[in-house]
Every structure is written in structure tokens, then in C-alpha cells.
UniProtKB/Swiss-Prot annotation:
InterPro entries: Pentatricopeptide_rpt, TPR-like_helical_dom_sf. It comes from Arabidopsis thaliana. This is Pentatricopeptide repeat-containing protein At4g19890. The keyword Repeat applies. PPR repeats lie at residues 146-180, 181-215, 216-250, 251-285, 286-320, 321-356, 357-391, 392-426, 427-461, 462-496, 497-531, 532-566, 567-601, 602-632, 634-668. PROSITE patterns: PPR.
Length: 701
């Protein structure tokens, strides 16, 4: 078997190269080579020996001598120090040396030479060296070390993109008697995961069963880690479920990765479910595991659950550290509970064990900036410096963002300059915070100037930058420039999220470009993005304004398919559209459905529907429609309705509602009275004005 892997010219060396056949006889090599250590460190050659044979003998002697001088540790590969130029050894001579050493001096000596050889580029990717070494070890019955050589080959060949070739050889070695082991196959999975070759790893996993290798806990763990790292959350969930079902328990490090990945993708409840399931299987969570869940709950806004998890952690004997406290402080600040966060912050300040770090201060500064308490934010900014903590880019960006939102651009620019003085360059997030606020304050030219400065510093626009620019162009009704930015964004590699697509769809709708908005809507769906309530409301509102009530109703009914619940604005838009088409009965049904859902109709919706009843001379139903409103809301709605009726010269119905208005509020407002007086005068019905004026003057409702 082995001889077939050797070059023909060297096969006879296995027979003619007389090396003592026991490891003890290595002392013989040491003795006979000691006389030559001061010269060329080579064995004396017989007259019949060729130069190649002499070189092989010399190398074998050097390896044996070096091996005896080393302190060997069973758990680690043996290393030898050979005072020998590897370049003078050919590929064929190298495999002859390793085969000869394995045959005559034992597996460990051969393995020493093997590791020495693959340390050189010349032999590192010479596949036959690995195969001959593994085959030689296999012939000695040393399957464990043969697998070790195969794993070494897998790692080294993966470096040059030849993983698949190496895996093929591992599989082929089964024909030579080396059946793939779970450790070797897990090595393949690990390499594939590190390279991001998840589909390849899945294929290898399937091949394991075919080859009779039973996947173990490490196999599943590697697949779970790979899918999570690659962002394939559903696939990771599937592998993790399979792992749990087989009773395999992840280690603490893997558990942290699982919990963090699930929480970052908004699957906090799923993370908690797995956490509980693993505990049921005997998993012992540590401080980092608990902190990962607490952080996820805080980012979700589930502060109460986060503190309940904290209590459970303490019951399990773990004391919260600065990272646990920082997660809670950050969560409290994001919910607007800054004072509660500050009390927790002070607890850290007074602690003898842990002190607030840069991230803790940054979270508190962000909380105060959110509440426009910039003086307190600045106080903490100074305090952290006094404590010997250096603000990082995120700290500066948080404070700059706070000042920009408050309109304090002078201080924001001052902080940006201070960053540079302290060795921190503002990043694109810093500039985004400034240009976003400038655009919202109608200072777009200044924002563009600042953005050009960012580009001159070598920064590049990210997805947020493009979103800000597109939103500004849509606000200016320059849809062409917005689309130009949108195209550039896609070419740069940034994908538009649903929020940005909503901005563009709304802009198209405002300009009554329904074909474009329809195309963009369909594109969004085809890309796997899920339209939101805002998307549908924009489309429905525009179709209603265009008088295309059928398409508006179609989009309204499709909302459920994407899990979108219409709000009062969605209902209001559709009711207005139905009223324009004189479909009052359908509009009334929608109005009742909106009330049943607990939604409060906008005033314009109430007025529109009541007005449609009045147009049909059905003031009684108009009265019934408005009857459930409380007094204040009723008065405001009826005043608006009276003015609308007056503008349409429907004085008779207006007088009826005006009379009802005076019954609830004897002091008519000037605007409504003026509108009614003008309408009566223009319609020649001054008697109505006289009658109502007398009632107002008497204060009679």
C-alpha cells in the first residue's frame, strides 16, 4: 500500500536502508553520528550508496538525534530542530524520509520530521507528503496520529483555497483503511465555518452520516455558530433546535453567541426560550450569559423583564458587573427613565468593586441629551475626564448629536474640533448626526458643505447618509435628485430599508406619480421587504385623492397579508375617498369598524362623513354620527361642519347645526358666526341670522 505512494526510484530504500528497528536503538544513531557533528552531520556512505540515499540517511540520523534531545509532551506535536537546509531536500526524498522513519523508528519520530517539513512553504502544500505520512502511521496502527495529519492537511490546504481537494483526499483515505472520524469531520466543519462556507459545511454534515460518522455536540455547535455569524438566523434556529432535541448542551461561550445573535435580530423571546430549555438540560449559565439576555431585553425596551432576569442572576450566585449595570442604564435611558438610570449610575460610582466605564458614561450622556438636559450631559462629560476616562468617538458623537438636535451647532462644531485635538477623528456617524439636524432645521446648504468636508477627510457616505439626503430632496419635492441619490446608494452596495422606501413612495404619491409608486411597491415586495402601515397609508391616500377607489380598497384589504393594522389615518383616507365617490354607506361601515377597533377618528373624517349625510339631506344620520363625541370634541367638530356647509351655500342645514351648537355652547365663536352670517347674506336668508343673533344676545340655547 505504502510503496505505491513512493516514487519508483526510491521504493527499494525501504528494504536497503538498514535502520535499527526499535525506538531504543535510536541511541545507536546518536553514537554513530556524534563523530560527525563537528563536520557535515552526515553518515558515512557505502560505495554502493547514491547521493540521494546518503542524504536520506543523513536526514534520518539528524531527526533521530534531535528527537532524543527533546522533552516530549504527549498532548502536543513533537518538534525537532534540524540544522539542515530544507531546500536541498526534494519532494520525493521528503516522503522517503517520513516513510523510512515510520517503518524503522516509529510513528512519533516520523511525525516529528513531518511537522518540521510542513513548516516550510516548499512542503506545506505537497499533498503526497501528508498522504504518505498518514499511510505510514496507519501501517503502524496509529490511527489517532494519522487523523492528526489529515487535519493538518485540511487546515494548510484551506489557506490556498484547496479545501475541497483536501476533503476529497480525507474521504478517499477510507479506501486505505482510515475511516473519517468525528474529530476530523468537525475540523472540516470548523474550517468551512471560518471561511463562511455555510452551504459547504451543510453538505459535509450530511456526508458524515453517509460515511457512518455520527455528528456530535461539536458538529451541531459549529453549524449553529456558522449560521449565526453568517446572519442566517432561521437556519441557525433549525440547527439549534436539532441540537437541543438530541440533548446536546452548548458551552457558555456558544450560549453567549446564540443569545446575543438572537437578541440583536429582535428575537429576544426566542433567546429566553432557548435559555430556559438549556437550563432544563443541565446548562449552568454564567454572568456573561445572564448579561447578554439582560442587554437584549433592555434594547427591546423590556426593562421590567430585564430587572427580573437580574434578580434571577443574583439568586444563582452571580453579582452584576459594570457591563450588566451599563446594559440596564442604557435601557432605562432609552425609555426616558433617566433619573432611575442615574440612581443606578450612582450605585456604580459608590461601588468598591466596579466603577462606571466609558460606555456607562456614554449611555448616561445619551439619556440626558434625549431629554434636552445638555447641562447635565456636559457635566458628566467633564466628570468622566476627571476620573481618568477618555471619551471615545461614540461618546463625542452622542453629545454632538444632542447639541445638534437642540440647535446648538456652535457647541457641536466645537466638540468636533476637540475630537481632532484629542486624536479622535469624527466618523461618518458623527457627520450624519450633524447633517440630519441641519436638514431638519432647514439649513441644507450648510449640511452639504459639512458633508463635503467629511468626504475631503476620506470618509464615505453610508446608508444613513444617503437616507438623510434622499429625505431632504423629497422634502424639497426634487424627486429626480432623490432618485439619483437612491441609485448611487444601490451602486455603492447599500440596500434601502423599508423606511427609506416609504419616504420615496410617499414622495411619488405627493406628486401623483402612481405608476412609479406602484413599481417601487412591487420591487420592495419582490426583494423580501415587508411593507408597513405607512407604506399602505401613502398608497391608499393617493389612490383616494386620484379617485381610484377600487385600487385603494385593494391595498386596504392587502394590509392584513403583511400583518399591517390600519390606523385612524388609513381609515380616514379611505373614508374620504369613498365619500368623494358618494359611497356613503360603505364609508359609514368603515367608520363603525374604526370605532369598534378603539380608534379615534380624525376631525376631518368626522366632518367629511357628516357633510356627506347633509348633502343627501340626511341631517338626522349626521347628528347620530356625531352624538357619541364628548361635548368639547362635538362642539369643535360641529363648528367646522357649519363653516364647511356655509362655504357650500347649504345655509338651511348649517342653521340647523348652528342651532344645536348654541344649545351646547351659547357663546358662538366669531369665525363660525361670521361664516354663517356671510352665507346667509349671500343666499338672501338674513332672517336666519336675525333669529340666531337674538338667541345669542339673550344667551338662549
Amino acid at each position: 500500500m505504502l510503496s505505491l505512494l513512493l516514487p519508483k526510484s526510491n521504493r527499494f530504500l525501504l528494504r536497503t536502508f538498514e535502520i535499527p528497528n526499535s525506538l531504543c536503538s535510536l541511541f545507536f544513531f546518536r553514537l554513530i553520528s556524534s563523530d560527525h557533528e563537528s563536520s557535515d552531520l552526515s553518515l558515512p556512505s557505502s560505495p554502493s550508496s547514491s547521493p540521494s540515499q546518503c542524504l536520506v540517511k543523513s536526514v534520518c540520523s539528524l531527526v533521530c538525534t534531535s528527537y532524543l534531545r527533546q522533552n516530549h509532551v504527549v498532548s502536543s506535536p513533537h518538534r525537532v530542530n534540524l540544522d539542515f537546509d530544507a531546500n536541498s531536500l526534494t519532494h520525493e526524498q521528503a516522503i522517503t524520509v517520513v516513510a523510512s522513519l515510520a517503518s524503522e523508528s516509529g510513528s512519533m519520530v516520523a511525525l516529528c520530521f513531518f511537522y518540521w517539513a510542513v513548516g516550510f512553504e516548499k512542503f506545506r502544500h505537497f499533498m503526497r507528503l501528508y498522504l504518505v505520512t498518514a499511510d505510514s502511521l496507519l501501517a503502524n496502527g496509529n490511527l489517532q496520529k494519522a487523523h492528526e495529519v489529515m487535519r493538518c492537511m485540511l487546515r494548510n490546504f484551506s489557506e490556498i483555497g484547496r479545501l475541497n481537494e483536501a476533503v476529497g483526499m480525507v474521504m478517499d483515505m477510507q479506501n486505505q483503511g482510515l475511516t473519517p472520524s468525528s474529530i476530523t469531520m468537525n475540523c472540516v466543519l470548523e474550517i468551512a465555518v471560518e471561511l463562511g462556507l455555510i452551504e459547504y459545511a451543510e453538505n459535509v454534515f450530511d456526508e458524515m452520516s453517509v460515511r457512518g460518522v455520527v455528528p456530535d455536540s461539536s458538529s451541531y455547535k459549529l453549524m449553529v455558530i456558522g449560521c449565526f455569524r453568517d446572519g442566517k438566523i432561521q437556519e441557525a434556529d433549525r440547527w439549534l433546535t436539532g441540537m437541543i432535541q438530541r440533548g446536546f448542551i452548548p458551552d457558555n461561550a456558544t450560549c453567549t453567541l446564540i443569545l446575543t445573535a438572537l437578541c440583536e435580530n429582535g428575537l429576544v423571546n426566542r433567546a429566553i426560550w432557548y435559555f430556559r430549555k438549556m437550563i432544563d438540560l443541565g446548562f449552568k449559565p454564567n454572568l456573561i450569559n445572564f448579561t447578554s439576555l439582560i442587554d437584549g431585553l433592555c434594547k427591546k425596551g423590556s426593562i421590567k423583564q430585564a430587572f427580573e432576569m437580574l434578580e434571577e442572576m443574583v439568586r444563582n450566585g452571580w453579582k452584576p458587573n459594570v457591563y450588566t449595570h451599563t446594559a440596564l442604564i442604557d435601557g432605562l435611558c432609552k425609555r426616558g427613565w433617566t433619573e432611575k438610570a442615574f440612581r443606578l449610575f450612582l450605585k456604580l460610582v459608590r461601588s468598591d468593586t466596579y466603577k462606571p466605564n466609558v460606555h456607562t458614561y456614554t449611555s448616561m450622556i445619551g439619556g440626558y441629551c434625549k431629554e434636552d438636559k445638555l447641562n447635565r450631559a456636559e457635566m458628566l462629560f467633564s466628570r468622566m475626564k476627571e476620573q481618568g476616562l477618555f471619551p471615545n468617538v461614540n461618546t463625542y458623537t452622542t453629545l454632538i448629536n444632542g447639541h445638534c438636535k437642540a440647535g446648538s451647532f456652535g457647541r457641536a462644531y466645537e466638540l468636533m474640533n476637540l475630537m481632532g485635538d484629542e486624536g479622535f477623528m469624527p466618523n461618518i456617524y458623527t457627520y450624519n448626526a450633524a447633517i440630519d439636524s441641519l436638514c431638519k432645521k432647514s439649513r441644507a446648504p450648510e449640511a452639504y458643505e459639512l458633508l463635503n468636508k467629511a468626504f475631503s477627510c476620506g470618509l464615505e457616505a453610508d446608508g444613513v447618509t444617503y437616507t438623510i439626503l434622499i429625505q431632504e430632496q423629497c422634502k424639497q419635492n426634487d424627486i429626480n435628485q432623490a432618485l439619483a441619490f437612491f441609485c448611487r446608494m444601490n451602486k455603492t452596495g447599500f440596500e434601502a430599508d423599508m423606511r427609506l422606501n416609504n419616504i420615496l413612495i410617499a414622495a411619488f404619491c405627493r406628486q401623483k406619480k402612481m405608476k412609479e409608486s406602484e413599481r417601487l411597491f412591487q420591487l420592495v415586495v419582490s426583494l423580501g421587504l415587508i411593507p408597513t402601515k405607512e407604506t399602505y397609508t401613502s398608497m391608499i391616500s393617493c389612490y383616494c385623492k386620484e379617485g381610484d377607489i377600487d385600487l385603494a380598497l385593494k391595498y386596504f384589504h392587502n394590509m392584513k397579508r403583511h400583518g399591517c393594522v390600519p390606523d385612524s389615518f388609513t381609515y380616514g383616507s379611505l373614508i374620504s375617498g369613498l365619500c368623494k365617490k358618494s359611497m356613503v354607506d360603505e364609508a359609514c361601515k368603515l367608520y363603525e369598524a374604526m370605532i369598534d377597533r378603539g380608534l379615534s377618528p380624525p376631525e376631518v373624517t368626522r366632518v367629511t362623513l357628516a357633510y356627506e349625510y347633509c348633502k343627501r339631506n340626511d341631517s338626522a344620520n349626521a347628528m347620530i354620527l356625531l352624538e357619541p363625541l364628548d361635548k368639547k370634541l362635538w362642539i369643535r367638530t360641529v363648528r367646522t361642519l357649519v363653516r364647511k356647509l356655509c362655504s357650500e351655500k347649504k345655509v338651511g342645514v348649517a342653521a340647523l347645526f348652528f342651532q344645536k351648537l348654541l344649545e351646547k355652547d351659547s357663546s358662538a365663536d366669531r369665525v363660525t358666526l361670521a361664516a354663517f352670517t356671510t352665507a346667509c347674506s349671500e343666499s338672501g336668508k338674513n332672517n336666519l341670522v336675525t333669529d340666531l343673533t337674538e338667541r345669542i344676545s339673550r344667551g338662549v340655547g
